[in-house]
Every structure is written in structure tokens, then in C-alpha cells.
């Protein structure tokens, strides 16, 4: 992957105060990779700037406050995340990764944003670098921060990314049970894979789908009243866990 070429952005990283940096980067479409950009809602609303960077796909990480500005022209994935330490982002990692990879299979370019391009959206970009290039959190974070100097996931997001890295690189020593379910009421279209502590038959709900992961096997359980979409997404998540 190419290193960021935005010399002005990199210079801003070194000399500006926090407030001045926020103001500067608010209008910057920060290049992370040739086909991956990171920025704010200001950039997300600038059709000409998105066109200049050949953006075809938009990952909106702040649907609670940022609309889909060009839904008839660009392909959107919208997440209704709040920038709070207790917000669970780990359960949607694989759906986010699928969005990235679907766009790249069609030779697309992805723009990722939240309100300011600081915490929510940068966390998703860091996740992608960790996954795609097999990086630890700190290395991926520094890569993104070199391109966008205001990059700063909140401590909750940071810890979840570190924990995910540990989970996918260390051997499975005990059974993990994941529930496949809508992420949240405001965002029923986003299907999440949430770790549950109820490992065993007593923890299974007939309205849901569950994936059990052992040291060497994956099992899919579909409840009698589970929606087809949950079952389909469960199979997608199993494919991810097998990689």
C-alpha cells in the first residue's frame, strides 16, 4: 500500500494545536490508502470533493447525527454509533469488513466518516488496516494518525480493537458463543455478532441464530423462529471466523 502523500496534512500533524487541527482537518479528505479515505461530515457533504477522489462507497459511522448526503449516487453503509466509551463496536467488525471488501471487489473507493473524523470513523479504518495487513493496534493507529493528525479513538474503542486483535491471533482455549442479532433498535439493518456469556443450550433463544466456536470447530444453531436474514449473516460471520 502507498504511504499518504498529503504533505500539507502531515505538516499540520506536527505544528498545529488541537483546536486548529480540528478546524484544518474538517475540510480534508485524508488519504489512508489508494482506495481508502477518512474524513468528517463536512467532506461527506461535499460532492465535488468526493468526486475528485473517485469515491464510490461511503461508510457513515455517525448515522445518529450525519445523514446519507448522496444516497442516489453513492453506495452507503450507515452505522448509528455514539462516541462513548461504553459503545460496543466489536460486534459489527465483520459487517464493516464485508463492506470494505465488497467495495474493493468492484474496484471501488471508500470514504469513511463520522462527525469530525476523529474517533468513530478512525476506529473503523484502524480495524481495516489491522485486518488487511495483520497489524497490531498501535502500528495501525500510527499509520492512520500519520495521514490524519486528529485521529483519536476513545479509550473504549481502543480497548475493543486491542481485545479483538488478541482474540483473532490467540488460540481458542474455551468455547465462545456469539449471538447474531440486530445491532440496536435505531439500526435494525445492521446485523451484529455479539459475544454472550451464556454458553450452553440454556443460552439459546429460538428467535435467534448462534455461532459456537471451539478450538477446532464452528457450529451454527438456528432457532425455530429466527429470521432468514439472521441465518444468512450467521453464515457470513462463520466464513470470516474461518479466515
What are these regions (language model features)?
Residues 1-11:
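Long, proline-/serine-/threonine-rich intrinsically disordered regulatory regions
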Residues 14-112, 116, 131-160, 168-170, ...:
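Cysteine-based protein phosphatase catalytic domain of the PTP/DSP
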Residues 121-131:
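Short, small-residue alpha-helix embedded
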Residues 241-243:
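Intrinsically disordered, low-complexity linker and terminal regions at domain boundaries
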